[in-house]
Amino acid sequence: MKVEEKVKELLLPILEERDFKLVDIEFIPSKRPILRIYIYNPEGTSIDDCEWVSKRIGALLDVEDLIDKAYILEVSSPGLDRKFKNIEEYDIFKGRDVVVKTKEPINEKKVFKGTLLGLEDEKVKIKENEETVEIPFENVSQTKLDF
């Protein structure tokens, strides 16, 4: 089992305590490995939220000894300009404003801005100018939050 999968198993119960969502986990092996955890609080992810998660998961990681040498642990929000990396993010960020870019045009458009309604039947649904737009998931080249 990969480090990210083991960390996820340990992390999910911690996040559930405060209704936080796991956005992504990155493990970068090197002389001094880096473990990056991206979390989302629907009420706004604060530094205190990141610190709380860092202390809790850090203590568990030390007990479980998943990483066999000194490592850097980073816990943060996904950031303003981060592109969606996994399908779960379409549920995590439901209700938020997004920009969706397509590979092929839909009604002569390749960029859609609106409120994310979610992913249903392999289609990304957004509310754009009071109209629901359905974009086949395989046609999506990029999705990110719109600030």
From Swiss-Prot:
Biological process annotations from GO: ribosomal small subunit assembly; translation
Taxonomic lineage from the root: Bacteria, Pseudomonadati, Aquificota, Aquificia, Aquificales
Gene Ontology cellular-component annotations: cytosol
Compartment list: Cytoplasm
Family: Belongs to the RimP family.
RNA-binding is among the record's keywords: no
Function recorded in the entry: Required for maturation of 30S ribosomal subunits.
InterPro entries per UniProt: Ribosome_maturation_RimP, RimP_C, RimP_C_sf, RimP_N, RimP_N_sf
Pfam families: DUF150_C, RimP_N
Gene name as annotated: rimP
Main location: cytoplasm
Entry keyword set: Cytoplasm, Ribosome biogenesis
Name the UniProt record assigns to this protein: Ribosome maturation factor RimP
